[in-house]
Amino acid sequence: MTANVTKLEDNKVRLDVEVPPEAVREGVEAKLRELRKQVRVPGFRPGKAPRRVLETHLGRDYIYMEALQESLPAWYSRAVIDADIRPIDRPEIHFDDPLDEKKGFRFSATVEVRPEARLGEYKGLEVPKREVEVTEEQVEERLEELRGQFATLAAVEDRPVREGDFVILDFKGERMAGGELPGAEAEDYMLEVGRGELLEDFEKNLVGMKAGERKQFAVTFPMDYREESLRGQSVLFRVHVKEIKERDLPPLDDEFAKEASEFETLEELRAAIREQLEEAARRRAEGEFRARVLEAVAERAEVEVPEVMVEDKAEEMVRSFERSVSAQGIKPEDYYRIAGTGREEFKRQVRDDAADTVKKELVLDAVVAAEGIEADEEAVRHEIEHLAEDSGRSPEEVEKSLRENGTYALLREELARQKALDFLVEHARAVPMPPEDEQMPGSGEEPGGGEGVVEARVESAAETEAERDEEGESR
């Protein structure tokens, strides 16, 4: 099979493809074998009707049309690989002549391809990097958090509720305008007052109440409340505080260190906490630096981001989010309902991030091309083994599946991008961060990839390819 490429305007190319006679015959024979099993021909057992009888029974044109519909996607995919192009949308297929088992078959495919970013300066850039510093206050805060995990709850009888207390209460709410309020009722509910688990005004009304006291008060739901039907609604709550409890914190001493950790003394525990905080701070600073390096390179590059790529990326981000929500046992449609939004609205919200991500991916692709970067075979094997472990299949099965659905190339592409980002970071010059930026929280996000991101993108791309194949078959 041969495929010639002609560049067109607007990032499009035309593939002129010639399918040899033997490939056409293979496609027709494959379809005939399938039809023999499906079609009942009087006088013949299923699967035994000869070709001439099937042609008489169904018509040669029908058989050729079915064979073409079955074979064309594979021929197009083969041509894309042979021509070394990277389509980003569905092709427009055109042909003049029908299948011919003696002459072969010719068709053209016009398709939009991935644009190439024009890199500006990308090596030796000066990029601010945050200094890693852990204060004594941070160590003490972490120590207090650990101390809180070993606290016990002691009953309070000689004072009313105050912030930080735990209360056990019954409550029931009903609309001030009349009518029940589903879900606004509980018995023996334990609440940490002031933590923000329930409405702020609800928790504030508990402060000052005593054990055994009953009270009713009105609360108005804020206009940005997650449940749209409750926004701005006034609700009357009847509350019965049954018990008040307060934290009884253990003393900070060597005995606590032994109970809470593998260390013998409090000072050893403090040192370990500092080391953990410093390591976490280093990771955040490195992640932020990598993001800043990529941002600096992207700012100096020129690239037009196609709308179809933004749409695909936004869909990928939504699907990744929905997988994450589902993994927590929450149905995506339930999440959208509770959050007062919908899937399409959520997709609109992530479009700017999607466009930014696509631009940076195109920039990394340009670095890959400029520096001749390739994915490491060891890294490819590692990702395939990781995917196999998650799916309960063998690495060989996973690799075969990735190659068949066209996402093996995507895996290598994503790993090459990560390697390109490593290259950019290695060739950047870290400079002290300006004081005004030091006050901003750092980002530990791995730009362009990271643990789990490759797998998510491969899965999402496989789903998208499957949907496109289905749509192609239906046309």
UniProtKB/Swiss-Prot annotation:
Pfam families documented for this protein: FKBP_C, Trigger_C, Trigger_N
Composition-biased stretches (Acidic residues): 462-475
Disulfide bonds: none
Coiled-coil segments on the chain, per record: none
Catalytic activity: [protein]-peptidylproline (omega=180) = [protein]-peptidylproline (omega=0)
GO biological process: 'de novo' cotranslational protein folding; cell division; chaperone-mediated protein folding; protein transport; protein unfolding
Chief location: cytoplasm
Record localization: Cytoplasm
Function: Involved in protein export. Acts as a chaperone by maintaining the newly synthesized protein in an open conformation. Functions as a peptidyl-prolyl cis-trans isomerase.
Protein name: Trigger factor
Organism field: Rubrobacter xylanophilus (strain DSM 9941 / JCM 11954 / NBRC 16129 / PRD-1)
Lineage, broadest ranks: Bacteria, Bacillati, Actinomycetota, Rubrobacteria, Rubrobacterales
